[in-house]
């Protein structure tokens, strides 16, 4: 009888260890150095400002001087100069990514642009490894669909937020990039709400024909 009782437990543990990475297709180009170099060229395209409209996103985030803002999945650090200016000398900017070769480029950008209020954090697929209770606003720009383990990542993003802090998701509509985007906007909202957040505001169009949803912890 004891052996029979234990079988469901072993089955559950096996299922958990084999839990699928939900963003494997979106992350295909990130698995090799050559692939990441190709992505980096896109991220650092000198014409990107015209399509991404970073200043529009910054304005919609309602960043105040002195805040601490985290750029989750910063990549090569494209948004860091814009965020650095927005928070000012008394503020802080955390640039987080899970790829060290991307972060090498972000570090160079911080040095070249003299972003004295910017810091780099190397995270993992499940944890940005930011200090607990340290961040006023977390920006997830074109990155949520890359989260392989969204539940775990959201739990750790929540842990890093200050009381009253906000999580800002900016991403593409699935209908526009069906081969790359995992969820429709409404399903993204449901997934994040299911992990202890509530919606505080939404915009149908910002940046590069993207949506923006701002969340606070429940």
Name these PLM-found stretches.
Residues 21-70:
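Class I SAM-dependent transferase core
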Residues 65-66, 89-90, 161-167:
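Short glycine-dipeptide loop
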Residues 70-128:
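Class I SAM-dependent methyltransferase SAM/SAH-binding core
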Residues 84, 151-166:
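A short glycine-rich, Lys/Arg-flanked "PGG" loop and its adjoining helix->strand segment in the class I
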Residues 128-138:
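A short acidic, Gly/Pro-enriched loop at the edge of an enzyme's catalytic core
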Residues 136-150:
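A short SAM/SAH-binding and catalytic strip from SAM-dependent methyltransferases
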Residues 166-190:
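Conserved class I S-adenosyl-L-methionine
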Residues 189, 201-218:
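Core SAM-dependent methyltransferase catalytic element
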């Amino acid at each position: 009888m004891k052996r029979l009782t234990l079988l469901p437990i072993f089955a559950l543990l096996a299922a958990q260890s084999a839990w699928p990475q939900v963003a494997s297709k979106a992350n295909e180009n990130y698995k090799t150095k050559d692939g990441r170099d190709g992505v980096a060229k896109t991220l650092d395209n000198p014409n990107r400002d015209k399509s991404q409209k970073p200043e529009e996103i910054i304005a919609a985030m309602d960043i105040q001087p002195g805040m601490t803002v985290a750029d989750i999945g910063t990549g090569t650090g494209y948004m860091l100069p814009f965020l650095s200016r927005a928070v000012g000398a008394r503020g802080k900017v955390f640039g987080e990514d899970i790829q060290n070769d991307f972060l090498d480029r972000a570090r160079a950008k911080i040095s070249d642009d003299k972003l004295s209020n910017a810091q780099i954090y190397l995270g993992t697929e499940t944890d940005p490894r930011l200090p607990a209770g340290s961040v006023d606003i977390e920006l997830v720009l074109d990155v949520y669909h890359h989260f392989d383990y969204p539940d775990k990542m959201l739990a750790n993003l929540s842990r890093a937020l200050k009381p009253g802090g906000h999580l800002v998701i900016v991403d593409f509509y699935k209908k526009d990039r069906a081969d790359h985007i995992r969820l429709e906007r409404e399903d993204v909202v449901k997934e994040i709400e299911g992990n202890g957040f509530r919606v505080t505001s939404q915009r149908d169009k910002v940046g590069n024909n993207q949506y923006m949803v701002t969340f606070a912890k429940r």
